Amino acid sequence: KRSIISKSSAIGKGTIVQSEVNVSAECNIGKFVKLNTFCNIMHNSIIEDYTTIAPNAVLLGNVKTGKLCYIGSNATILPNICICDNVVVGAGAVVTKDITTPGTYVGVPARLLKDI
């Protein structure tokens, strides 16, 4: 099955894009990122190096993730959110505000479960 990557988006060296991934306009995907099946990266988003986006995760417009992050299956990151380095977002979590402290975040809305 095919993935769709906008011509205006950039994909870094060593990044893995699995099937049925959607990367829309003006996105910048870093080096050695993993985009799992059925994830959606919406316009003007930035994913820093060594980050994993799990299956069915959705990053809505203008989202920025730091380095070494893990966005869990079926997680949703709302528009205009920034996530710092070294953050784990649990499966099904909904991130409604910026995350500025490294750690594990779970729930709806996402809240800090554990510091890293």
Regions found by a protein language model. Name each.
Residues 3-106, 110-113:
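Structural signal for interior beta-strand "rungs" in well-ordered beta-sheet cores
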